[in-house]
Amino acid sequence: MPVLIPPVEHSQDTRVGHPAWREATRALAEEAHQLTDRCGQEAVTMWQPNESVRDPHVAHHLCRAAYILPWRFRVEMLKGGSTMEKPPPGEGVTLWKSKMKPPAWHARLPLPMHRDARALQTAEVVQAHARGARLTAARLGRAQHQINGQLRLLQRQREATDRRLSEVRKALLINQQSVKLRGYRPKSETISDKADSMLTWEKEELKSMKRKMEADMEKSEALLKTLASCRDALVFCCKERLQAVELMNQPLDKVLEQAGRHSWVNISRVPTPRTQGLKTPPPDPVGTYTPECAKALYEAKRLLMESKDTLLDMAKNEEDIREQQQQISDRVCASLAQKMRETLELKDRLNMTLGLMRGTIHRCTKFNQEMYITRGLIKGPLSKSHLETREKLDRPLVRMYQRHVGTQLPEAARLAQGTDKLQRHISHVEKNLDELLSMRKKLTWSFNCKKIGHNVDYSVVRLRLRQRHPQVCYEQAQRLVNDWDPRTPPRVKSNTAITK
């Protein structure tokens, strides 16, 4: 009698892992999610008002929807029955495309211009403290201030020009390293091309830029020394004039305003024919406006005009050279990239030719082997005892046929002729196979040369793009040119040298 087995109850949960294991992973993920939200919220709250911090017990999308609701445009009814959307009132940036106007955020941390603001406040305090001299001292101080500002501008421009000169020198080193790297190509790839001409042209242009910027540096250095000597003369004359008015509580700017002369406030301004306000007194050796002061002010005005023209020329040259250097570098990189594409195209063509030749060589080799087998089959066995009956020349059928004169069978002669013809064909196939192998060797060598040339050009482009980055200084590029050699292994110190 059959026995009925009760059906096995299958659980609804088909997962294999233990629930505690899943709960631990879920708890860890939830903890990481909460930590991410908390850290992100704390980082954002440093740049947002207090009311922007969301409630941790409310969903993120609900908090965001409630927070940005006042930002949205409001629909207003017009008299004609039409509607018009207007942004909400108050400060903020109006986003017309998204129809929102977020309010202005207030930073709780010092802004990046905090240092400049404090420096400006300090300068204002110092300038306010320095206002306490008479008219001549005020004019000398004003001239000294403008000369100092011009000195700072000239110094900054010299720094910018020096940085650009360093970039030009670094570009020369990069050019030298590029030529050096391209020298490691195989002999078949070292034929002079447009990329070499571009590198030579780049070198000449960079040398011309270098000479031009060195001339600007020499000119600005001489002007800087002249401005410094003029500033020292103004400082000496100003201190000498201030000796008699140290106790007079009257600002220098106020004195210049009361004088009513714009050319005294700004010494680079050309004076008008109709003078309004106070007039410049004649130089008096025993008066307030001495010939030394007049000479210092005249020299300061002349140098200020000259330095402005020099600054404009230097800034224009620096900008032009920067753009020209960038264009030249891009053109050289473009020519190298074009050479890489051409090399890659030729390399692919050689690779396809090698593949086709490889198949032909395999077929010729197989055919040659089959011809050897065919020749062996045609020649037959080495021993007579191994011949088949139908191949023997003394078999009864042949002897009966050869009883009459002139009835010789041409079987042996034709076998010899076929064997000789097959041997000549085998020799011809072997000759062709040798030519194919020789040509494959040449193609492989040319393919490897193209590959090396492509890798060298790629390394040159990569080196140029990496070395022309502003963070790479001139010394690093110089060490790269002087110390690194791709074909020279690193120096290994011997034990004797270490002991010494």
From Swiss-Prot:
One of its GO terms (cellular component) is sperm flagellum. It is found in: Cytoplasm, Cytoskeleton, Flagellum axoneme. The keyword Coiled coil applies. It comes from the Eukaryota. Residues 198-229, 420-444 form a coiled coil. Keywords: Cell projection, Cilium, Coiled coil, Cytoplasm, Cytoskeleton, Flagellum, Phosphoprotein. Pfam families: Tektin (PF03148). The keyword Phosphoprotein applies. One of its GO terms (biological process) is flagellated sperm motility. Its main location: cytoplasm. Microtubule inner protein (MIP) part of the dynein-decorated doublet microtubules (DMTs) in sperm flagellar axoneme, which is required for motile flagellum beating. Forms an extensive interaction network cross-linking the lumen of axonemal doublet microtubules. This is Tektin-like protein 1. The gene is TEKTL1.
